[in-house]
Amino acid sequence: MIGYICKYTPVEIIEAFGEEPVRLESGYKSHERAEALIHSNMCSFAKGVLENIIENNIEEVILTACCDSIKRLYDVLKDKVKFIHLLDLPRKKDPLAIDLFYNEIIEFIEAYQAFKNKNFAEENLLKILESKSFNKEKQSAESIAILGARLKDDVIEKIRNSCTAKVINFTCTGEERVFNIEAKDNLLKSYAESLLNLTPCMRMAEDRSKLINKEFKGIIYNTIKFCDFYSYEYAELKSKADLPLLKIETDYNDSNSGQILTRIDAFLESTGIKKMEKQKAKKGYFVGVDSGSTSTNVVIIDENKNIISYSIIPTGPKALESAFKAFEIALKNAGLQEKDITSIVATGYGRVSIPFADRIVTEITCHGKGAFFIDNTVRTVIDIGGQDSKVIRLDDSGNVIDFVMNDKCSAGTGRFLEVMARTLGISIEEMAKVHKEVKENITITSMCTVFAESEVISLIAQNKDQRDIIHALNKAVASKAISLVDRIGRKGKYMMTGGVAKNQGVVYAIESRLGEKLIIPFEPQIIGALGAALISLEGK
């Protein structure tokens, strides 16, 4: 068995040796053993691959000189494994590049022959290539493209299972290895040329704009934290491609996280290609369950879209128990029994953990639906919850057409304010008061909850007025929210939802930055659950 990482690896030559090539993936939650050998600031993919090699005791590795991180991985491994080879990968596919890559493949064959003490047979390679020789399937306009850095196979499969369109994977793991070798008299050189003619990755100098079909339904673009390659292409696509575009950022130990899957599901819903079971609207009562990180909210409506009852309880250690409890309270408040309920839709981060729901829908779609129902003049929804914040753009019909999320940390969220209230020794209710008149206009320089807490402690030690500190914290939260608004562009009217919408100080700070009043619903915490209930009623 020999491990490899790159699609330009001569996998078929390894197979011709009678060996098993295994694509190395990154996805380990901990890089503890890898970080003992490689700097902690190294690319997360390279660290994950190193962790994989250590975990599975892989003794043979072939790498390509894709980037500096992979070159450093080679440096670490060259005295740790029995066999390692680094292929120099050209950036072009002109005749000189083909000659260079051909020579690199010859060097690998010679090195592997010496290591294995066996001869390479071209006839074996020819048989393998002929078995992989057929025409590639044509692209379909009714497709969604995945670009950028490689995504884990299970995430790709979830996207395929979740949408009605064909998924075309343009990342380095997506293309099927097919070959049409014509010059069989110089098999290895033709093979080298075929490898360089694979769909170009960001390592190559070839123009990748030809990959994009203008009739695609949308693009999911994956970037790696701190990787130099992909953000440049994403920025160009964002400015030039007239297609729905979703950017996700992973470090390979979080690509299957609830936040990332929420973004993907919401994107598929907004483009109209999310798989949904078709249902007819029925008479009766309809329930929306919003299982959030901090609170669980339930709304019951009737067939005329009247809110019959709702409940809000803290989300405990188990999302399912909280959902059951909130559902029971809402039923009791409405004087109903479970048998009276026609349909239930679940949303929020815990939506997949609610087995009694008939369907699940992302909170992006549900907040948009609920906000537009409350006020159909709303075009931008600012939702600040316990652990994340998001801004949602609606069209004139209330459909979600764009959204941005801050879900990587608790900066600018309800949790941020709770920590600061505890540090100040006051209740969250006291902190929610508006402090328009301040003695000193203090600025909190860090949005990181940990560092901001240290700043607050320092301000307390300097005997700063508590109201001035609260005002500074409200400004910090508002600044984070406004940065999200500006990423999708300002467009009124604005509605604020989520528990933080009850904080008058934050609301005032955001209004001051926007220069426009926010619409605050009668109960901002239930808007997601209300949207879920409306979707349950409409049966779409």
Residue ranges: model-predicted function:
Residues 101, 315-319, 396-397, 401-436, ...:
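Glycine-rich phosphate-binding loop plus the immediately following alpha-helix
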Residues 1-286, 304-306, 316, 323, ...:
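An N-terminal assembly and electron-transfer interface module characteristic of large anaerobic redox
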